């Protein structure tokens, strides 16, 4: 029974009839291609609609979850009770001098392309990261010795009470896969990056080089959520997993990638349960062998199947 159907008309008044989906399978909205239904999924088209939706949820004690591209997200098979607010249609990007300003739902690849067109360097490391900028800032995403903290100037955020304010780089308190946004449960609305002038060909060649390395080393041909585990201090997760003999290990349709042990992939027909069971199996085996605790980098939400 979807207890939030009574609020459909109110959400439609905020975001429009075409932007409210009922009992929507989350496997359509995550890069893992798994996940049960969300009671409601809405796609606001303005920041004001985001604010109004959050206030409606707060005033009626409706649980809500923000997602961008769903590329670092695992939704359990029982789905999500409450409302998913998807930032898909909040992707505006503008360039002002050496700054790039992007709404939270803008894919990192689009932001990189806009920076490239304007001969602005600094974001090359992010060009192959499949997520949206809001999620990237929230977890201080990084790759190839670069991370968001190196290029961000500020972020406009909203809190659970609907207050909108600006956080500068220091206030964002960005660390390894962490931020003040996670700590205080803020939601990113807009991000300003401060980049540097560079040569078009220099930027382009760096992007092409990093993308070539990704294609060579990562199992991009299968659904996944990127690196499954955070890097444990003093170790590399993929090496620990490989040295435990788990490369290629499978449970149901989930597999530790044979190409890169740091990735758990959906080899075909996996459930969220398969992936979660494999994550736990890997964690237990690595702990047994090396006494190292692997923490997931992927965000896990939703209900177990009854």
Swiss-Prot record:
Residue stretches in coiled coil: none
Pfam families: FAD_binding_4, MurB_C
UniProt xrefs under Gene3D superfamilies: 3.30.465.10, UDP-N-acetylenolpyruvoylglucosamine reductase, C-terminal domain, Uridine Diphospho-n-acetylenolpyruvylglucosamine Reductase, domain 2
Segments traversing the membrane: none
Stated family: Belongs to the MurB family.
Chain's role: Cell wall formation.
Origin: domain of life: Bacteria
GO cellular component: cytosol
EC class of the enzyme, as a word: oxidoreductase
Species assigned in the record: Clostridium botulinum (strain Okra / Type B1)
EC number, as in UniProt: 1.3.1.98
FAD-binding PCMH-type domain: residues covered: 34-198
Pathway annotation: Cell wall biogenesis; peptidoglycan biosynthesis
One Gene Ontology term from the biological process aspect of the record: peptidoglycan biosynthetic process
Listed InterPro entries: FAD-bd_PCMH (IPR016166), FAD-bd_PCMH-like_sf (IPR036318), FAD-bd_PCMH_sub1 (IPR016167), FAD-bd_PCMH_sub2 (IPR016169), MurB (IPR003170), MurB_C (IPR011601), MurB_C_sf (IPR036635), Oxid_FAD_bind_N (IPR006094)
NCBIfam families to which the protein is assigned, alphabetical: murB, PRK13905.1
Cofactor: FAD
PANTHER family associated with the record: UDP-N-ACETYLENOLPYRUVOYLGLUCOSAMINE REDUCTASE
Active-site feature positions: 177, 227 (proton donor), 297
Subcellular location: Cytoplasm
Known catalytic reactions: UDP-N-acetyl-alpha-D-muramate + NADP(+) = UDP-N-acetyl-3-O-(1-carboxyvinyl)-alpha-D-glucosamine + NADPH + H(+)
Name by which UniProt lists this protein: UDP-N-acetylenolpyruvoylglucosamine reductase
Keywords: Cell cycle, Cell division, Cell shape, Cell wall biogenesis/degradation, Cytoplasm, FAD, Flavoprotein, NADP, Oxidoreductase, Peptidoglycan synthesis
UniProt GO molecular function: FAD binding; UDP-N-acetylmuramate dehydrogenase activity
């Amino acid at each position: 029974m979807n207890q939030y159907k009574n609020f459909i008309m109110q959400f439609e008044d905020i975001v429009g009839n075409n932007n409210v989906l009922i009992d929507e399978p989350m496997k359509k909205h995550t890069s893992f291609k798994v996940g049960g239904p969300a009671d409601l999924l809405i796609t606001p088209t303005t920041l004001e609609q985001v604010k109004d939706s959050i206030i409606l949820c707060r005033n009626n004690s409706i649980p809500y979850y923000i997602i961008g591209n769903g590329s670092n997200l695992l939704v359990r098979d029982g789905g999500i009770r409450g409302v998913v607010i998807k930032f898909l249609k909040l992707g505006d990007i503008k360039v002002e001098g050496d700054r790039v300003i992007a709404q939270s739902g803008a894919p990192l690849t689009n932001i990189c392309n806009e920076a490239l067109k304007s001969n602005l360097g600094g974001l090359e490391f992010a060009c192959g990261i499949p997520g949206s900028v809001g999620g990237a800032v929230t977890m201080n995403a990084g790759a190839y010795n670069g991370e968001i903290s190196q290029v961000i100037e500020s972020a406009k955020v909203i809190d659970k009470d609907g207050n909108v304010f600006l956080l500068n780089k220091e206030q964002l308190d960005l660390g390894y896969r962490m931020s003040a946004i996670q700590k205080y449960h803020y939601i990113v609305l807009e991000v300003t990056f401060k980049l540097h002038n560079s040569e078009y060909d220099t930027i382009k060649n760096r992007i092409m080089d990093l993308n070539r390395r990704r294609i060579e080393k990562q199992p991009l041909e299968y659904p996944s959520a990127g690196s499954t585990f955070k890097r444990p201090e003093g170790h590399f997760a993929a090496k620990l997993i490989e040295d435990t003999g788990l490369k290629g290990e499978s449970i149901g349709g989930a597999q530790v990638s044979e190409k890169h042990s740091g990735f758990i992939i959906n080899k075909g027909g996996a459930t969220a349960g398969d992936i979660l069971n494999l994550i736990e199996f890997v964690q237990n085996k690595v702990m047994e062998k090396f006494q190292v605790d692997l923490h997931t980098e992927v965000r896990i939400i939703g209900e177990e199947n009854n």
